[in-house]
Amino acid sequence: MEDSGKTFESEEEETNYWRDLAMTYKQRAENTQEELREFQEGSREYEAELEAQLQQIETRNRDLLSENNRLRMELESVKEKFEMQHSEGYRQISALEDDLAQTKAIKDQLQKYIRELEQANDDLERAKRATIMSLEDFEQRLNQAIERNAFLESELDEKENLLESVQRLKDEARDLRQELAVQQKQDKPRTPMPGSGQAKRTDMAVQATGSVPSTPVAHRGPSSGLNTPGMFRRGLDSSTSGTPLTPAARISALNIVGDLLRKVGALESKLASCRNFMYDQSPSRTSGPASGRGTKNRDGVDRRPGSTSVGDKGSGKRLEFGKPASEPASPALPSAQGVVKLLL
């Protein structure tokens, strides 16, 4: 449309113009046809490849279906075998339980007969020996309870120290965040902002410092959780007394604070699980053995002078973990103490 209104100075110029234009369109047409041929060839190759892949996938699907059917049959056979073995095992267990009941009955009869014979021969000597053994066992249990209470008191002291360390770390983290914000505001017109990696680390450190749980904390040892905050604070004091810290150094300090707070949180959760375990164990403690021993002592056997002081000492040092103060230690307590030590 635009070429129709164009004027030429001579017919030769017009002829050359239209010839060049025709060559240009011809070249474009040839290029377009070449691209079309290449596209058709590529599409045919791609179609052939897709058909080959489809055949492979169909073959694999058939193989998987056959494998699935085989596995289903094997599962059914295994279920049948398991049911047969289960029924056979149940029958054997029933037979063994009957044998055990008969054996226990015979054992009870024999023990009763033996007790009657021994009671006729040495009743007084046996009573004295049983009383002495019960007193020794009671004193041993009192000593174990006192040791356990002392251990729990030391754990409470360490918990208080860790709470102070956590509060101090929170204050230091808040001060570091405020100083970092002020430093960034001051350095913003002069220096470029830190990269995305440093900003991400800063956000992670701030989130870590703000996500400390509020449950009571536990402590692995006297040197792992108490020395680290003090050393970290001394490092901060020495760094702030000299030249001001760079943003990268402050970010690394925040990362250290976040790691320490996460460790303290893990210790808190462990102590909470230990306390829950102790709460679960406390309702099962009964006063049967101790009351029986007390009856024997009142029936005519003199009590030892040291047993009264040990009992008073144990009742004075007993911690209130959801248990009455007058309840003695039971045989289940040593196992609970072992579980607590294992968790710690």
From Swiss-Prot:
Region of interest: Disordered: 181-246, 279-337
Record localization: Cytoplasm, Cytoskeleton; Cytoplasm, Cytoskeleton, Microtubule organizing center, Centrosome; Cytoplasm, Cytoskeleton, Spindle; Chromosome, Centromere, Kinetochore
Role played: Required for centrosome duplication and formation and function of the mitotic spindle. Essential for the development of the cerebral cortex. May regulate the production of neurons by controlling the orientation of the mitotic spindle during division of cortical neuronal progenitors of the proliferative ventricular zone of the brain. Orientation of the division plane perpendicular to the layers of the cortex gives rise to two proliferative neuronal progenitors whereas parallel orientation of the division plane yields one proliferative neuronal progenitor and a postmitotic neuron.
Gene Ontology CC: one annotated term: cytoplasmic vesicle membrane
Provenance organism: Mus musculus (Mouse)
Lineage of origin: Eukaryota, Metazoa, Chordata, Craniata, Vertebrata
Subunit annotation: Homodimer. Interacts with dynactin and PCM1. Interacts with CENPF, LIS1, CNTRL, dynein, tubulin gamma, PAFAH1B1, PCNT, SLMAP and TCP1. Interacts with ZNF365. Interacts with RAB9A; the interaction leads to RAB9A-dynein motor tethering. Interacts (via C-terminus) with MCRS1 (via C-terminus); phosphorylation of NDE1 inhibits the interaction.
Protein name, as recorded: Nuclear distribution protein nudE homolog 1
Biased composition (Polar residues): 279-289
